[in-house]
């Protein structure tokens, strides 16, 4: 989770000056972290975040936009919490904050998705909504086979709204539900990199992209190595099998075999794991690999025909599983 902390630290340093963008980020942060309480007929907005920096950012933005200050409570780390949590509580002005950020509708009912001013807003507001959502409950995994950027959401409607905001900024995201928890997931590497850049985590994006390229290059090298190794094993098995068949062919034909075919066959028997090209260089005089292959094919064909005439096991009978013990 080191990358997640780096992303959040960088996002908390992003300077926002436009009020519409700031409002979108605040509304999103509250949507994905806040709970609404009714205390003495007054709505209290309570938001729980995982860092002092995020708590300070949210406090400053709300104060700048709405002139409302929260109570700040720190909950220490415990058995179920690795880090302290920061609870911001707006008791005075909670109703106004909930209405202005559309946590509730005009008649006071809770809204489950994102505010309409984000859904129908600008691309900058969609980016701000994603920044707020990531600061609220986002994390990113190290690049690899299962790399992902995820945001936990309080409802399916909130997840679908975030997917829609991602689509507006050309980022591919999907919803996912596991054990009753709704999430928005981005798995495409290019989309993850684009979103990090848009949100303002450029430095972390460069680190993530570098790790991604390293993993991809390593995986490609491993695939090539495995491919080459498999090819070598197949070639070695074929050469050993051919040598066993040639040896059986020479037994069947005995001395009744043309000298040039016998010479090629003897080379195959003496150099069991050599390639055809290597056998051609060892021949006297040297031959091409096609010439060696042709002579060995004719030798085996002659021997199989002779074995059929005499009722003997043919050259294929010499190829047994024990031959490949040393090769595999």
Curated annotation (Swiss-Prot):
Database matches in InterPro entries = Homing_endonucl, Sporu_reg_WhiA_N_dom, Sporulation_regulator_WhiA, Sporulation_regulator_WhiA_C, WhiA_LAGLIDADG_dom
**What would be an example GO MF term here?**
DNA binding
Provide the transmembrane region boundaries: none
Q: Which GO terms describe its biological process?
A: cell division; regulation of sporulation
The feature table lists the DNA-binding region at 275-308
UniProt keyword terms in alphabetical order: Cell cycle, Cell division, DNA-binding
Give a Pfam family name.
LAGLIDADG_WhiA
The text of the family note is: Belongs to the WhiA family.
What the protein does? Involved in cell division and chromosome segregation.
What is the protein's given name?
Probable cell division protein WhiA
- Origin species: Corynebacterium jeikeium (strain K411)
């Amino acid at each position: 989770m080191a990358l997640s902390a780096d992303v959040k630290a960088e996002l908390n340093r992003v300077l926002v000056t436009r009020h519409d963008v700031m409002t979108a980020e605040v509304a999103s942060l509250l949507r994905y972290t806040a709970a609404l309480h009714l205390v003495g007929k007054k709505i209290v907005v309570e938001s729980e975040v995982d860092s002092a920096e995020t708590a300070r950012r949210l406090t400053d933005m709300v104060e700048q936009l709405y002139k409302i200050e929260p109570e700040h409570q720190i909950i220490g780390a415990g058995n179920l919490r690795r880090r302290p949590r920061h609870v911001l509580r707006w008791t005075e002005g909670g109703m106004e904050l909930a209405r202005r950020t559309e946590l509730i509708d005009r008649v006071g009912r809770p809204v489950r998705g994102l505010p309409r001013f984000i859904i129908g807003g600008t691309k900058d507001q969609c980016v701000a909504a994603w920044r707020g959502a990531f600061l609220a409950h986002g994390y990113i995994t190290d690049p690899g086979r299962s790399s992902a950027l995820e945001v936990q959401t309080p409802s399916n409607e909130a997840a679908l709204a975030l997917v829609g905001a991602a689509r507006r900024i050309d980022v591919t995201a999907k919803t996912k539900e596991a054990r009753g928890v709704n999430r928005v997931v981005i798995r495409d590497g290019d989309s993850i990199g684009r979103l990090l850049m848009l949100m303002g985590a450029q430095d972390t994006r460069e680190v993530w992209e570098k790790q991604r390229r390293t993993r991809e290059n390593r995986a490609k090298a491993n695939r090539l190595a495995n491919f080459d190794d498999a090819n070598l094993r197949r070639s070695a098995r074929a050469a050993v099998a051919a040598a066993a068949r040639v040896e059986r062919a020479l037994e069947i034909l005995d001395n009744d075999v043309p000298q040039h075919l016998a010479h090629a066959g003897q080379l195959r028997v003496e150099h069991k794991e050599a390639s055809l090209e290597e056998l051609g260089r060892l021949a006297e005089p040297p031959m091409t690999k096609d010439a060696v292959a042709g002579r060995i094919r004719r030798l085996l064909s002659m021997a199989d025909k002779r074995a059929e005439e005499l009722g003997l096991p043919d050259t294929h009978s010499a190829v047994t599983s024990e031959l490949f013990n040393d090769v595999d």
